[in-house]
Amino acid sequence: KVTLEGFSRGGLYALNWAAKNTDKIACIYIDAPVCDVFSWPGRKNAALWNDLLKEWNLTDEDMNSFKGNPIDNLEPLAKAGIPIISVCGDSDKTVPFKDNMDVVRSRYLALGGPVEVIIKPGVDHHPHSLENPEPVVDFILRHQPEYEKYLHYNVRGSLQNSFVKFEKERKGRVAFLGGSITEMNGWKNRIEKQLQQRFPYTTFEFVEAGIGSTGTTPGSFRLQNDVLSKGKIDLLFVEAAVNDHTNYFTPLEQVRGMEGEVRHALLSNPEMDIIMLHFIYDPFILMVAKKQQPDVVLNHERVANHYLIPSVNLVQEIGERMQDGEFTWEQFGGTHPLPFGHTFYAAAINHLFDSMWKGITPDSPVVAHEIPEEPLDEYSYYKGDFIDLKEAKLNKGWKYVPSWRADNKYEKRRGFADVPMLEATRPGDKLTLDFTGKAIGIFCTPGPTAGILEYSIDGAPFKKL
């Protein structure tokens, strides 16, 4: 299958040929494309209009019933699910965007076809393309059959609600909950840009709630404070396979934590779409080579199955690509990927979008997700929240610091500095807290300022933490 590229009037040729040869097309890239000959060249441009008539062997009268405009021949492409990406200047005076690609986008979406548009503000017909063509290259690469054979994602439930809200209401709030792979500049930032390409008229708010080293147990307790308190979330990404594994959480805790995040999120807003991600790190590589799945992935997948949450298994995909010699672990970038590695994470998520948004139109209904009456584990942390630090009774030595920062020369992690903190510096310092609940934890700072806590609940013998 081929990728068709059409610039300017080349867009006319590319779209028309593709509509008659859908079985031969992988994807289409069109740049400032002519999609309606009545817009360009148009009858006002007599010389070019006559060239058009000559080329098509038509008369001016014949044009009153002309059927060769791409804007009128999109249905075969949409039925075949041919992905289209377009780059256009919004100030194009030669081939006006509003009369051409904007019409294609609107009609293609209405037919359920996948389309992305990169709009260049203030740009006329020239210059074509992008100074950095990476978004187009990524789009083309991820739609090649050879690329797709490595993909491992599970389609469950629906992502219809987020699509309809983004396209119809033209407002969207997207949240990213996870550890340092989510916190860093990488897949998250690419998805933010690519969502804007898919929905160029939508105003997005992105809630970036990645904190290094945190898995689902702290995630389920900080969900309310770090994500849900920001407003109604339309699309939520959750990931924690690496940190739930490297921090030695038990299988039981892995389920309770992930279910805590997912169930709490859905109970807060049943219309919220959720996507679960599984990232790779060193210990998982050998498991893939042995055709094994990490237990933490299987445990998180139990939650995904119970709540019909789609998931993307990057452990399997990246492991297989490395086995086949496509790249090395060093080239990928390791646990915290290089930009090269993050392109694979983002591409897999985009494939899930393509699959689950296929056939959905802006007029599709928004439907609440069904939430199972019973949780997988009655002790899951789906009512998790932060307790106000001021509720603690500070006895000997403890103090409340409104904006705490470690007094040392070392690098400070976001989320562990310039935040409210209870601080004690001497052995024997004490505090007490009254609470009612099935579980409680203490969110501690890491690093050289960390200490050892001894705790007792309901008069039980003290234990070290």
Predicted regions located by residue number:
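Conserved catalytic region of serine esterases and O-acyltransferases that act on ester linkages
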Residues: 145-158, 169-170, 343-465
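Short, proline-enriched alpha-helix->beta-strand connector loops that line the catalytic pocket
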Residues: 77-84, 113
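C-terminal catalytic histidine-bearing segment of alpha/beta-hydrolase fold enzymes
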Residues: 98-147
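Mobile cap/lid helix-loop segments that gate and shape the active-site cleft of serine hydrolases
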Residues: 33-34, 38-76
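Short beta-strand/loop motif that positions the catalytic acidic residue
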Residues: 86-88, 92
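Primarily recognizes the serine-hydrolase "nucleophile elbow" in alpha/beta-hydrolase
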Residues: 2-47
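Alpha-helical cap/lid subdomain in secreted, periplasmic
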Residues: 189-205, 209, 214, 218-365, ...
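Catalytic nucleophile-elbow at a beta strand-turn-alpha helix junction centered on a G-D-S/GDSL motif
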Residues: 171-186, 211-215, 439, 448
